[in-house]
């Protein structure tokens, strides 16, 4: 799904479709290594080094470590096109997947860090001054899950994710003392 989403987003971001799809397809490859299994904080970091040792281009390798960014509300963002595109599609894929099975954050619990993912998507778009058709990206992500015959428990996923993103956007604006009107 990440590979297909990255290809879809590449048109909006005007980046090389084939390269970003390669980056997406190897973005999680280090998660099955014993080292990352033992030291989860090395996810992405080791992926970058594994990719470099396998001869992948530096910008593709960097996207593996950078796509986990941002880690919080004020932390560093991915700044390179492959990195921020993989970061956006990874976070969209997670949001869509969890919303499809009705695993949404509540006022007191967010065990899958979906609020952080949503804020990350918005910060990446805003701070990198990107033009992304989020509605289209979310719709395409839902279709990819449907094609895999994933049991969909929530038929309102697209609307709910857009509302969820709007609420996170309100929070971002509030923190920056920008009026919502």
Model-based region annotation:
Residues 1-181:
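Amphipathic alpha-helical "coupling" segments that flank catalytic cores
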């Amino acid at each position: 799904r990440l590979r297909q989403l990255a290809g879809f987003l590449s048109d909006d971001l005007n980046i090389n479709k084939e390269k970003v799809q390669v980056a997406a397809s190897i973005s999680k490859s280090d998660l099955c290594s014993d080292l990352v299994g033992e030291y989860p904080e090395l996810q992405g970091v080791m992926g970058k080094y594994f990719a470099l040792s396998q001869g992948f281009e530096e910008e593709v390798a960097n996207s593996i470590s950078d796509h986990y960014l941002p880690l919080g509300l004020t932390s560093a963002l991915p700044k390179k096109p492959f990195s921020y595109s993989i970061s956006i599609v990874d976070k969209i894929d997670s949001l869509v997947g969890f919303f499809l099975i009705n695993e949404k954050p509540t006022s007191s619990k967010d065990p899958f860090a979906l609020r952080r993912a949503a804020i990350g998507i918005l910060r990446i778009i805003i701070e990198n001054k990107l033009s992304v058709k989020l509605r289209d990206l979310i719709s395409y992500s839902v279709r990819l899950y449907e094609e895999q015959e994933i049991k969909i428990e929530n038929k309102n996923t697209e609307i709910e994710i857009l509302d969820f993103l709007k609420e996170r956007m309100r929070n971002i604006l509030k923190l920056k003392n920008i009026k919502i009107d």
